[in-house]
Regions:
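N-terminal amphipathic/basic leader segments beginning at the initiator methionine
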Residues: 1-19
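Buried hydrophobic positions in well-ordered alpha/beta secondary-structure cores of metabolic enzymes
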Residues: 4, 47, 67, 98, ...
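Conserved N-terminal alpha-helix of the aminotransferase class I/II PLP-enzyme fold
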Residues: 13-64, 86-91, 97
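Conserved core of the PLP fold type I
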Residues: 55-76, 106-113
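Conserved PLP-anchoring active-site segment centered on the Schiff-base-forming lysine
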Residues: 74-92, 121
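Hydrophobic beta-strand scaffold residues
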Residues: 82, 105-106, 173-175
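PLP-dependent aminotransferase-class I/II
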Residues: 102-149, 153-161
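Catalytic PLP-binding core of fold-type I/II PLP enzymes
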Residues: 154-177
Length: 177
């Protein structure tokens, strides 16, 4: 049976342990992101190079819930919420972390964990068409998990369609995976 509950509650691949053992006695910094941590510094440089921003500030977080809360609360304005599948990770498994930051999770219907571009577009059209929208949570981001909580995977066509809807409405598409 395949279980997609959590990627850090299962055994690690033997090659992961080999890599850890190979570097087990390398001394690195702790409690800060000092220059003494060669592994984090190497990762920062790879991220900067991949993004094409050589002077970018790169920070590392310890877990997915913390990361989702920081990213979502930073990208949304105070009056905005995030659209997510009713079964999405931020709607079900993160103990209200997003709502604790003051942002509503706008849950929408899904099929096997996936939300459709049409359903997302409908949320934006409904909000923009409502004469009372100034008193409502504005959808400011779309959140998906890849793979979903059911283990289903968005196809390239589905991702492209979601991305196009997000671009049309001027909001980010956040992929948690």
């Amino acid at each position: 049976m395949l279980n997609f509950a959590c990627d850090y509650l299962d055994a690690a691949h033997p090659k992961v342990f080999e890599a850890l053992m190979k570097n087990n006695f390398v001394k690195t910094g702790c409690y800060d992101e000092s220059e003494s941590d060669c592994f984090c510094n190497a990762a920062r440089e790879k991220i900067r190079a991949a993004c094409g921003v050589p002077d970018a500030e790169v920070r590392f977080l310890s877990g997915g819930t913390q990361t989702n809360k920081v990213v979502i609360s930073t990208m949304l304005k105070p009056w905005q919420g995030v659209i997510a599948a009713r079964t999405g990770h931020i709607a079900v498994h993160e103990a209200g972390a997003i709502e604790a930051s003051g942002h509503k999770v706008i849950e929408i219907a899904e099929h096997q964990g996936k939300i459709s571009a049409e359903a997302v577009d409908k949320v934006f059209r409904a909000w923009h068409g409502d004469g009372n929208r100034l008193h409502m949570v504005e959808p400011g981001m779309v959140y998906i998990t890849q793979p979903t909580e059911y283990g289903t995977v968005y196809s390239l066509a589905e991702l492209t369609a979601l991305s196009e809807v997000c671009r049309r409405w001027g909001v980010p598409l956040y992929v948690d995976g």
